[in-house]
């Protein structure tokens, strides 16, 4: 059996669901990048400066807490990062959310942009 045959046997409703989920994740990343006025390229880059890393960690936090996305999928969407990087970013922002009013306000504002209802 060839790769083409295998891929043709995947149910189209399953593929639509997978791609639909990625659209949701990408929207969250886009909203974060727009909020911080940085490009999507910067969000997925290897740049570790605080001006880029913090929004990226907030995107990790939102993808993890607002979806059922596996950590490795979040990492793939954010430039091929390892699941342990995602765990670190999510934990860091989670701690800040609990202890820092500014971080809480930023995240709540971004959540409202993602889900205005």
Task: Please state what every model-predicted region is.
Residues 1-18, 25:
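Conserved C-terminal helix/linker of AAA+ ATPases
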Residues 2, 26-27, 33-34, 67-76:
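Short, charged amphipathic recognition helices of the HTH superfamily
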Residues 14, 31, 35, 113:
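Residues that form generic nucleotide/phosphate-binding pockets
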Residues 18-19, 61:
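A short, ordered amphipathic alpha-helix with a cationic face
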Residues 19-20, 51:
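Residue-level marker of alpha-helix boundaries and capping positions
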Residues 20-46:
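Basic, low-complexity segments
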Residues 42-117:
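Terminal-proximal interaction/regulatory segments of ATP-powered molecular machines
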């Amino acid at each position: 059996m060839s790769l083409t045959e295998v891929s043709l046997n995947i149910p189209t409703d399953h593929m639509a669901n997978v791609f639909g989920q990625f659209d949701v994740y990408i929207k969250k990343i886009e909203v974060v990048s727009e909020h911080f006025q940085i490009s999507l390229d910067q969000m997925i880059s290897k740049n570790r400066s605080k001006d880029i890393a913090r929004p990226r960690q907030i995107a990790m936090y939102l993808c993890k807490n607002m979806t059922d996305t596996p950590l490795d999928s979040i990492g793939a969407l954010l430039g091929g990062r390892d699941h342990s990087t995602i765990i670190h970013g999510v934990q860091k922002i989670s701690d800040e959310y609990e202890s820092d009013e500014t971080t809480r306000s930023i995240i709540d504002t971004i959540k409202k942009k993602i889900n205005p209802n």
